[in-house]
């Protein structure tokens, strides 16, 4: 019921406006314009007469990421309004049925955008980043774990670390903390899994890290498949070499069973485990489960608590991470725009105005020795231990 309430309140906020949505403070005429490009999918939720297409009390979860990011952006705008900051948000629905995002950008009226914030897929990012490069407009992506094949674009910033960065960080963490322990990578067969392996092998070879053992498991793997690769005389670091969350859970549960026998093991995984609360359950007790993620918010700071209080009293719900990511993105880059104005492109790696987490925005240099884009290289490591998750670095 809580999810139902928050969804309809957010959706109602969106459909009050015609496309593109405009949200602004009561400020002087000259203001900075930030494009907010999100998958709102309003055409799938309402008809031409603004009637909802869904049955009563239906909860369309696929709409939530864009709507939640939008709500976080509006809350940040409200905070900026208290400072009388001249900010205008121009909101475009990247999944609009009538016009694709490229057409919407080309037809955008009014003064040019000063900056674009986007939650999108890889195809959309290529279109948006090309537009930003052509118009000299910084484009900040908040969600993609890859660069969409983009090169030579000094106006692009990826706040979500790429898969390569995540893999390298995990390997370096294991090497620094467990130098002398055997590492076994359990994986399923697949193209993405092969790419993950290539990242690790390339990194480990360059840094002269002891060679890891790779084991391809069948779909119906059992405890026996795992124990055959473990050593009863010493600890083993096990790594899930896939982004498949279900594979990771199955691996964790069976390794927990193994750990109750003669084996001492620890398990490491990638950020797809970040949304899972299942590791608190009894079947995962007995082993340490560690993963890395570019986003971590303990929610103990004053701003996070204010957002949580607003959701609790107004929406009767708890804000998702996407709400807070919307807030932090608008807050950080609106303030950078206000401070640096037309020179914002020279500050895309700035660590100013960070709210909930530390970021390390670094230039990524391509094969042609050119600046391809900026990427957040900061990874947080979290560990599930006996049903409790804690930050370890």
Model-predicted segments: where are they?
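Extracytosolic ligand-binding ectodomains
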Residues: 2-12, 21-393
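Hydrophobic membrane-targeting signal helices
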Residues: 16-18
């Amino acid at each position: 019921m809580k999810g139902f309430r928050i969804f309809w309140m957010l959706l109602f906020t969106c459909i009050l406006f015609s496309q593109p949505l405009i949200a602004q403070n009561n400020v002087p005429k000259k203001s900075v314009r930030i494009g907010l490009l999100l998958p709102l999918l309003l055409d799938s939720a309402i008809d031409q007469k603004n009637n909802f297409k869904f049955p009563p009390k239906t909860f369309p979860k696929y709409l939530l990421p864009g709507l939640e990011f939008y709500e976080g952006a509006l809350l940040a705008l409200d905070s900026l309004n208290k400072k009388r900051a001249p900010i205008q948000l121009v909101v475009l629905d990247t999944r609009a049925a009538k016009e694709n995002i490229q057409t919407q950008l080309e037809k955008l009226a009014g003064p040019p955008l000063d900056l674009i914030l986007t939650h999108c897929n890889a195809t959309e990012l290529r279109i948006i980043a090309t537009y930003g490069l052509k118009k000299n407009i910084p484009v900040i992506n908040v969600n993609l774990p890859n660069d969409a094949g983009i090169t030579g674009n000094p106006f692009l910033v990826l706040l979500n670390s790429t898969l390569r960065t995540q893999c390298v960080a995990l390997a370096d963490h294991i090497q620094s903390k467990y130098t002398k322990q055997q590492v076994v990578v359990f994986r399923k067969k697949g193209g993405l899994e092969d790419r993950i392996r290539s990242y690790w092998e390339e990194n480990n070879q360059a840094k002269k890290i002891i060679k890891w053992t790779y084991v391809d498991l069948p779909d119906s793997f059992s405890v026996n498949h795992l124990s055959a690769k473990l050593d009863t005389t010493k600890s083993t670091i096990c790594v899930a070499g896939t982004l498949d969350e279900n594979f990771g859970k199955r691996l964790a549960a069976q390794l927990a069973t193994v750990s109750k026998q003669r084996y001492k093991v620890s398990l490491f995984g990638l950020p797809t485990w970040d949304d899972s609360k299942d590791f608190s359950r009894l079947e995962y007790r007995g082993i340490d489960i560690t993963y890395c993620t570019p986003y971590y918010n303990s929610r103990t700071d004053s701003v996070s608590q204010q957002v949580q209080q607003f959701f609790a009293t107004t929406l009767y719900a708890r804000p998702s991470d996407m709400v807070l990511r919307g807030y932090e993105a608008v807050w950080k880059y609106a303030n950078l725009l206000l401070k640096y104005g037309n020179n914002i492109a020279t500050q895309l790696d700035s660590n100013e105005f960070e709210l909930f987490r530390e970021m390390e925005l670094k230039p990524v240099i391509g094969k042609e020795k050119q600046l391809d884009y900026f990427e957040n290289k900061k990874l947080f490591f979290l560990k599930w231990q006996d049903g409790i998750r804690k930050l370890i670095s």
